[in-house]
Amino acid sequence: MKLTWLGHSAFRLENGSAKILIDPFFTGNPGFAGQDGKSAAEGITHILLTHGHGDHVGDTVQLARETGATVLANADLAAWLSAKGVAKVDMGNTGGTVHFDGFSVTFTNALHSSAQITEDGVSHSLGNANGLMLHFEDGPAVYHMGDTDIFSDMKLINELHQPDIGLVPIGDRFTMGGAVAALACQRFFKFQNVIPCHYGSFPIIDQTPDKFVAGMEGAEARVHTPKAGDTLSF
């Protein structure tokens, strides 16, 4: 498996024939600046969205049109994407699992909101915010937490899904901060590898992973802090 952090909460994941983008926020993402959007989206088969905020939906509509990738989102967000002209949309909701060729995606809880704001400044709800649990027929299980705070049912997510790799938001203000995120990983999960995300993108969220790294001292999980654009192999 190859996993590339594309800044903020955006990741590219390759495993077998699956080439997946999660929350592809490219345009306007300072962490993506200087990266090649065509390379990041090359050959993608699926786009997975945790929720409807603009810094997660990102370039989904354009990328779906250009690549023909299937987009998976919660039911409300999926309907919105269809109205925007996305041809191949699949949907699910919290607790549900969607099966694709070689992998499956389960929608988990996340403590956050999900909406798009129209030009008149009105916020329109687009279903629940979710985490995404990816299981592969051959490869490690990956849990993208989405945007969330800590919650005790994370213990059940670990019990049910036993994720190997955690993609963990740590930026504070809109998600849990680094120290709390480390507590979540240490108390509720048995990750082998963790990658912090949703930090350093904008001035109002934490700029470094230092608090998370410090909180993970002594953990069995290996903490990776790649630069945006770096690829890790598992």
UniProtKB/Swiss-Prot annotation:
The keyword DNA-binding does not apply. One of its GO terms (molecular function) is hydrolase activity. The keyword Phosphoprotein does not apply. InterPro entries: Metallo-B-lactamas, RibonucZ/Hydroxyglut_hydro, UPF0173, UPF0173_UPF0282_UlaG_hydrolase. Pfam families: Lactamase_B_2. Keywords: Hydrolase. SMART domains: Lactamase_B. It comes from the Bacteria. Belongs to the UPF0173 family. This is UPF0173 metal-dependent hydrolase Atu1317. It comes from Agrobacterium fabrum (strain C58 / ATCC 33970) (Agrobacterium tumefaciens (strain C58)).
